[in-house]
Regions:
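Long, largely alpha-helical accessory region at the distal end of helicase-like NTP-driven motors
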Residues: 99-100, 244-250
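Residues immediately C-terminal
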Residues: 2-3, 35, 178, 215
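SF2 helicase catalytic motif II
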Residues: 1-26
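Conserved C-terminal RecA-like helicase domain
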Residues: 65-69, 74-76, 81-169, 184, ...
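Interdomain hinge/linker at the junction between the two RecA-like core domains of SF2 helicases
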Residues: 35-82
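Short, structured coil segments at secondary-structure junctions
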Residues: 22, 42-44, 137, 182-183
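Conserved segment of the helicase C-terminal RecA-like domain
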Residues: 20-34, 186, 190-195, 199-243
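A short beta-strand-to-loop transition that corresponds to the Sensor-1 phosphate-sensing loop
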Residues: 1, 29-33, 91-94, 172-176, ...
Length: 250
C-alpha cells in the first residue's frame, strides 16, 4: 500500500495500467486477502477465489510444550538439527542472534569447503580479521539481518541455496521475509518478537516465516520447529485498500 511503501506502490500501479491497456484477461495472486475495495484495477473482475493448500507437506512441531522455556534444551535441539539439512533460524532480536552466533562458534567444528573458506578469508581481509561473522561462516552458519551490507547478505543467501557450498544454516531477523526468496527444509523459531520495540509478530508475518519451510522440487517435506510459543497479533485476513495515485490517471 502507499502507506507502507509509497514508491513501490506507484511503480506497481504504473505496471498494472500498462497491463490493462494490453491484456483483456488478467488475474492477481496474493496471500491472506479477505476482500478488495472498489478500484479501477479490479473493476469487472470475478470475486476473490480463496485457495487453501500447500504445494509441499508442512509439518509443525510444537516443541515449546516439551522445552518449557528451558534454554539448555533449546540449545541442545538446535545444535543437533543444524548439523544437517538446510535450516532457517528465526531469532528475531539482535541479542538472540549474537547468542546463537557464539553457540555455533563454540560448538561446531570448521567445515572444509573451498567456497566457505574463501568467503571467510575475504571478510577478514576486507572488514576485520576478528569479525565473528567470518568465524561463524567457517562453521557453516550465516547471518541475515538489516545491519549487514546487502552484498554480504545476498552472497550468504547464494551460498545457502547452493546444496554443495557447506553453508547449511542461516540465522535471521524479520529481514528474511522482506524480499528474500529462499527456503529450507527446516524453519526453527528460536524467539518470536518482531524486533520492533519488542512487539510480537503479526500472524501474517509469522505465516510468511513458516512459509519458508519446504519448496516444490527441492524440499518436498518442510518442518517448522517452534521452540517458543507463538503469541501473535491477530491479522489473519486482510481487506486490501488500493489508493490510486492521481498523477497516473489521465
Amino acid at each position: 500500500s502507499k502507506v507502507n511503501d509509497k514508491e513501490r506502490a506507484v511503480k506497481l500501479q504504473e505496471a498494472l495500467i500498462k497491463l490493462d491497456r494490453k491484456s483483456k484477461q488478467k488475474y492477481f495472486l496474493a496471500p491472506n486477502i479477505k476482500s478488495i475495495n472498489d478500484n479501477p484495477f479490479t473493476d469487472g473482475m470475478i470475486p476473490i477465489v480463496k485457495l487453501d493448500f500447500n504445494t509441499v507437506v508442512l509439518k509443525h512441531h510444537k516443541l515449546y510444550k516439551e522445552i518449557k522455556n528451558d534454554e539448555e534444551l533449546k540449545k541442545k535441539f538446535i545444535l543437533k538439527t543444524c548439523r544437517s539439512d538446510k535450516n532457517l533460524i528465526y531469532a528475531a532480536l539482535y541479542k538472540e542472534i549474537h547468542k546463537l552466533q557464539q553457540l555455533f562458534i563454540n560448538e561446531f567444528e570448521d567445515i572444509k569447503s573451498e567456497k566457505i573458506i574463501e568467503f571467510s578469508n575475504w571478510l577478514k581481509s576486507n572488514y576485520d580479521p576478528d569479525w565473528d561473522l567470518a568465524n561463524l561462516i567457517l562453521k557453516g552458519v550465516g547471518i541475515h539481518n538489516g545491519r549487514l551490507h546487502r552484498s554480504i547478505t545476498q552472497y550468504q543467501v547464494l551460498l545457502f541455496d547452493d546444496e554443495n557450498s557447506g553453508l547449511n544454516s542461516l540465522i535471521s531477523t524479520s529481514s528474511l521475509i522482506e524480499g528474500v526468496n529462499t527456503s529450507a527444509k527446516n524453519v526453527i523459531i528460536w524467539s518470536i518478537k518482531s524486533g520492533q520495540g519488542n512487539n510480537n509478530l503479526t500472524s501474517l508475518s509469522y505465516k510468511n516465516i513458516k512459509g519458508r519451510a519446504g519448496r516444490m522440487f527441492k524440499h518436498f517435506v518442510g518442518n517448522v520447529y517452534e521452540l517458543v510459543e507463538p503469541k501473535l497479533k491477530n491479522m489473519d485476513d486482510i481487506q486490501l485498500s488500493i489508493e490510486i495515485d492521481n498523477s497516473l490517471i489521465g
